[in-house]
Amino acid sequence: MIEVFNEKEFISKTLQVRGFADTVIIEDSKVYVYDIKTINAWAYKMRFGRSVKKKGSIHQELQVATYGVLAEQEYGSIDGIFLIYYNKDNSHIKVLEVDRDKMLTAIAFWNSIKVEHKHGLPALKKGVSPAMDWECKYCSYKTQCDKDKLKGE
């Protein structure tokens, strides 16, 4: 029997994190987690073309690894975590398996976040939080950051 879940919500009380995996497939008690990344042809070529100029994003790997950790907590095991890159310009698809060791890195990351938050809202770290400048437009704290930037903070 195969079960497929799209936008599967996971909540971890131990890590104090909530996330939505794009797809979770359970087949014969094996659990697979997928996160889908949509990119344009140029970004796809830079990542997968003959002369690869850009390595995969550690942030994307840690995102899907976090979903893997959460799935393992819910289902008791995890058999694979994957990033699916979809080229929106020509519909080409590339599936990459993420090393399950990244799950340990994700656990360490979320535990460090819990420690930081014990002392109040942590400061922003360029390249970490936010990982990319464009992420700011999706953040609940954007207006506060904009005010802080104007003050020189």
Task: Annotate each PLM feature.
Residues 8-9, 52, 124:
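Residue-level detector of alpha-helix boundaries and kinks
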Residues 1-14:
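A short acidic/basic microdomain associated with nuclease active sites
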